[in-house]
A protein has these predicted regions:
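A penicillin-recognizing enzyme superfamily signal
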Residues: 1-172, 177-178, 183
Length: 185
């Protein structure tokens, strides 16, 4: 997920950024290797889709009164078979955070989706930690940070146009999912 807020640039993990001597002088510094793996436009397209998870989908609890996060963020919930693992990965322009709830023994798992899905098990961890991050002014991460739309971005660059009133289309099977989901908020 780090390639999305970095607009398609992959940074190789780097454990040590510099080495100082006893006097505090930097004797060596290191920068991560980086390469473009996705165009800015495609990265922003993913950002836009993953923002919808927060604004309209399984991550929308972050917008509710419990967490009340109004920042420009994207994210993705995830649940493995038999509710053994719940995931939430969220990101803002300056930080990506992954939360996992699960265990090594695959036979031990939540009994139902009500508790075992990523939106119920891992997202609350993200919500609480994200509030603390925003409250800590020393980190340089604020709720006012926003994603920049690339100047060359076009949401319909494939030549396909959305259907008129596409947002109003709801299939009958979707209503049951939304009602069940709302019952937990």
């Amino acid at each position: 997920y780090t390639i999305f807020p970095s607009y398609g640039i992959h940074y190789s993990p780097l454990l040590v950024t510099h080495i100082e001597d006893a006097n505090g002088d930097i004797v060596a510094s290191f920068t991560p290797r980086m390469n473009e793996v996705l165009s800015k436009e495609k990265a922003y397209q993913m950002i836009d889709m993953l923002k919808a998870v927060i604004n309209e989908g399984t991550g929308r609890a972050l917008r509710g009164s419990k967490y009340n996060i109004r920042a420009d963020i994207g994210g993705k919930t995830g649940t493995t078979n038999s509710h053994a693992d719940g995931w939430f990965i969220g990101f803002c322009p300056k930080l990506v955070v992954a939360c996992w709830v699960g265990g090594e023994d695959r036979d031990i798992h939540f009994g139902t989706m009500a508790f075992g899905q990523g939106a119920r098990a891992a997202l609350p961890i993200y919500g609480k930690k994200k509030k603390k991050i925003y409250d800590n002014g020393n980190l340089g991460i604020t709720e006012k940070d926003t994603f920049d739309i690339p100047a060359t971005y076009s949401p319909c660059d494939d030549g396909l146009q959305a259907l008129p009133n596409a947002e109003d289309i709801l299939y009958p099977e979707d209503e049951n999912i939304l009602e069940a989901d709302d019952a937990f908020f």
